[in-house]
Amino acid sequence: MARTLGKTLSSQELDFYRDSGYLIRDRLLGPDKFEALGEHFEGKLASLSPEERPEDMDVPHFTDPELFRWLFDEDVLDLVAQIIGPDIALFSSHFFCKPPRDGKSVPWHQDAYYWRETINPSTEAITIWLAIDPSTRENGCMRVIPGSHLTREARYRDVTRAGSVFDEELDAAQVDESRAVPVELLPGQASIHAAGLVHGSEANLSSSRRCGFTMRYISTEVRFNHEGLGHKHQIYLARGVDRAGNVYADPTRSYPEVIGNRGRGQSYLGTRRPGA
């Protein structure tokens, strides 16, 4: 598993990402920035109502502009630019937290499948998964199938078991679990993965919490379906210039109406039904 510490990715690391669809970074933010993010997250987690699941803290930046301190962090964007180019839009973010002995499982899936009505092409996005807590095999760390982002054909089926974050999953015949690699992270470490990479995670049956912050980016050459879905989602120009005629939201504003239009929990936008 390739790991990188410095700001600049080597040609070997970039080749690994292109071939495998993921990469591990030993440090994403400086210590002070990471500590501040952790404190900010703990405040948000503590404010959840009893009926709100900690896995469902999706798109928190729509109503919390302070999060752009980290989403637009120059070190983060420097890293993103090496993978998708200099013109960058923030696509989404998500605090994903699995409480001990209770966290839901995430079935095998490709992010691009759920975004196919939102961005075009939906495969041209990357996700940074920043560990707030240790993410281990015991508490349900992410597992990936290296190289699976290079295969475009995919069949999905309904999830019938309880306790799943999503309501659809890849057909089991399409996933060779013997090739799965656990992505274990210490606090402050981060993984980067392509939108087409097959990945998932088990429920957290351990006594330790597993929380992380996902930051999702696209090149501004990717087209966002603002006409059809602008009432449920927004993107933000993070660096550079627009290349696709996209409409961008204001990072200094709050958009509670967008949250209201999405509904509670994991919303897939478009014509898809919401997940569990």
Residue ranges of model-derived segments:
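Non-heme Fe(II)-dependent double-stranded beta-helix
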Residues: 1-119, 157, 228, 237-241
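Non-heme Fe(II)/2-oxoglutarate
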Residues: 2, 45-47, 196-276
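Short, solvent-exposed loop/turn segments at secondary-structure junctions
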Residues: 29-31, 96-98, 113, 135-137, ...
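Aromatic-acidic/polar surface patches that form glycan- and anion
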Residues: 30, 65-72, 121, 177-186, ...
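Generic beta-strand structural signal
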Residues: 86-93, 104-106, 124-130, 140, ...
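Short, conserved beta-strand element in jelly-roll/cupin
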Residues: 109, 118-137, 184-186, 192, ...
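Short, surface-exposed loop/helix-turn segments at secondary-structure junctions
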Residues: 110-111, 165-177, 209, 228-234
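Double-stranded beta-helix
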Residues: 135-202
